[in-house]
């Protein structure tokens, strides 16, 4: 009898443990019946990192392993392109932007390229060896002008096609793991270890440092459409500024799911819905400001982490890994 009781107890413990572990991977959010996304396989092991367009139809996708693709139909099809770069260097093309036909590419190590013909030809610009950090984010500002930010928070501006650059910050922010720019030229960054974030506004000489709001390290941070901030922290926590203009005032943590995977990016579509992308095909949407969430059925089927989302007013993409890409087509499912 004692042996029988021990066996029954062990079986009960196994069942309880199994239920507990399965609970760790339950999303607790419903799956939407439709999706605006179309899954695309670029047939490459490279990771897409950024996308930009010269007009509604023509654009470029860049990424790791020197990847550059061109589209002439709004992103429905992507054709391989190449850049005139040394074969022995494996560049990561991190950022691309256009103002009309004038384009810029920033990459690592030490790569900056410029085009004045819609990307048909690219010229490499050799940067000063004393440049703090590596190119991280490039923004086209108009004719002959661009703004370059590095991975230590140095910000420079050119008005002569990159022949010379003027520093806009007297003291860099230090190593960053994420850095974003708003439409008005403000920046926000997350420190390399995720233990604080910093903001910079045009006219400031230095970055303003802000301590994280909880013990969870920060993953990424960016701007909402109204100019306030959003924050994603470890533990799948989302927070939004709850006082307009106060970058130290944050909402309580929003935790839509507890599936063991964190979020890597947050973005708003043109209808005001919030999209959260992250590990293992995590792609969630909230249409009520974060109160309730749905799981996207197309994203859920992708064997990829979603690292970035791009909404530019005319196009929308979710960038994954190893050639995985989602394109907004509206009601794909």
From Swiss-Prot:
It is a lipid-anchor. One of its GO terms (cellular component) is plasma membrane-derived thylakoid membrane. It comes from the Bacteria. The keyword Lipoprotein applies. InterPro entries: PSII_CF48-like_dom (IPR028203), WD40/YVTN_repeat-like_dom_sf (IPR015943), Ycf48/Hcf136 (IPR016705). Disulfide bonds: none annotated. Keywords: Lipoprotein, Membrane, Palmitate, Photosynthesis, Photosystem II, Signal, Thylakoid. A factor required for optimal assembly of photosystem II (PSII), acting in the early stages of PSII assembly. Also plays a role in replacement of photodamaged D1 (psbA). Assists YidC in synthesis of chlorophyll-binding proteins. HAMAP family: Ycf48. Part of early PSII assembly complexes which includes D1 (psbA) and PsbI; not found in mature PSII. Binds to the lumenal side of PSII complexes. Interacts with YidC. This is Photosystem II assembly lipoprotein Ycf48.
């Amino acid at each position: 009898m004692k042996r029988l009781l021990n066996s029954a107890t062990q079986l009960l413990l196994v069942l309880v443990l199994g239920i507990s572990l399965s609970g760790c991977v339950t999303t607790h959010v419903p799956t939407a019946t439709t999706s605006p996304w179309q899954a695309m396989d670029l047939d490459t092991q490279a990771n897409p990192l950024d996308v930009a367009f010269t007009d509604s139809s023509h654009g470029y996708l860049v990424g790791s392993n020197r990847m550059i693709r061109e589209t002439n139909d709004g992103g429905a099809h992507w054709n391989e392109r190449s850049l005139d770069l040394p074969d022995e260097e494996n560049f990561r093309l991190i950022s691309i932007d256009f103002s009309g036909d004038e384009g810029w590419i920033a990459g690592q190590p030490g790569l900056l390229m410029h085009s004045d013909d819609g990307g048909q030809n690219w010229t490499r610009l050799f940067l000063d060896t004393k440049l703090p950090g590596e190119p991280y984010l490039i923004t086209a500002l108009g004719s002959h002008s661009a703004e370059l930010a590095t991975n230590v928070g140095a910000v420079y501006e050119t008005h002569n096609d990159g022949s010379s650059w003027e520093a806009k910050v007297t003291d860099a922010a230090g190593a960053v793991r994420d850095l974003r720019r708003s439409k008005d030229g403000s920046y926000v960054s997350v420190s390399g270890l995720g233990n604080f974030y910093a903001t910079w506004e045009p006219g400031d000489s230095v970055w303003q440092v802000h301590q994280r709001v909880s013990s969870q390290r920060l993953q990424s941070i960016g701007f909402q459409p109204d100019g306030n901030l959003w924050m994603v922290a470890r533990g799948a926590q989302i927070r939004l500024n709850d006082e307009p203009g106060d970058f130290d005032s944050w909402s309580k943590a929003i935790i839509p799911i507890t599936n063991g995977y964190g979020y890597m990016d947050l973005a708003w579509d043109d209808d005001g819905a919030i999209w959260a992308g992250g590990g293992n095909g995590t792609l969630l949407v909230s249409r009520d400001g974060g109160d309730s969430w749905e799981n996207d059925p197309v994203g859920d089927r992708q064997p990829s982490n979603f690292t970035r989302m791009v909404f530019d007013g005319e196009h929308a993409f979710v960038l994954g890994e190893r050639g995985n890409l989602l394109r907004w087509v509206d009601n794909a499912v």
